[in-house]
Amino acid sequence: MSTPNSLSRFLDPNHIVVFDGAMGTMLYSRGVFINQCYDELNTRNPDLVRAVHDEYLRAGADVLETNSFGANRPKLAQHGLEAQVHELNRAAARLARDVAGDRDVLVAGAVGPLGVRVEPFGPTSLDEARGYFREQMKGLLDGGAELFILETFSDLHEIEQAIRAAREVDATIPVIAQMTIGVDGLSPYGATPEDIARSLDAWGADVIGLNCSVGPQRILEAIERMAPVTQRKLSA
C-alpha cells in the first residue's frame, strides 16, 4: 500500500516517477477488439485488467493507472452503460489497488475527454461537462484512487472543467493534467505549449504535461518549451 511518503516523492520536483503504459493497447493485444467498451471489462472480465496491471507492476511502475479512460457518462452511453458510471469507475480503482497490494505504489484515476464538444465549440455546457467529470471522479475515489490523471485532452476549456471537478470532489488530491499536440506542436485547437503550461498551472494542476498523438521527439520539444513558463512538475 502506498504511504504519505509516496505522495511526497510523487510531488518532489527532483524525483522521477515512472508510470505504467497504455491500457487499451495491452487489452487489444489480448484479443479485446476496439468495438467493445474497454471500461466495462472492469466488471465483465476483471482478471484480464488485473493481468495488465500486474505486468506493469512487475516491470517497475511506480504508479498504476485505472482502466477508466472512457468511463464517463457520454462515452458509456454509446454502449448503453451510462447507468454504470460509478460502478465501473469504482471497480477500476479497486482492481488497480488490489494489484498494488502492500507495495509502495500509487493508484491514479485515469480520466479522459468526454467525447463531446463543450462550449464554445459545441453544445455541452461547461457546467454539464464538470458534472460528468465529477460523477466519474467520485467513483474512482470510492474505489481507492489516490490521484487523478487527466489525459489526452485537446481542448483547454474541457480540461479546465476536469481540473475544477477534481478540486470539487477532493480539494487536496494531486491532479496531473495532460494535453495532446499535433506534429505542428500545437493542440488541435491551436494552443501553444506555452499556452498549455500557463493555463494548466493557473488552474491549479499539480503536474502538467503532454501525452499521445505524436512521437517522443515532438513531445520532448514541446515539454522543453513548457518548462521555462511554469514551476510545476512536468509529465510526458
Q: Where would I find each of the regions flagged by the language model?
A:
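Domain-level signal for soluble alpha/beta catalytic cores
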Residues: M1-A236
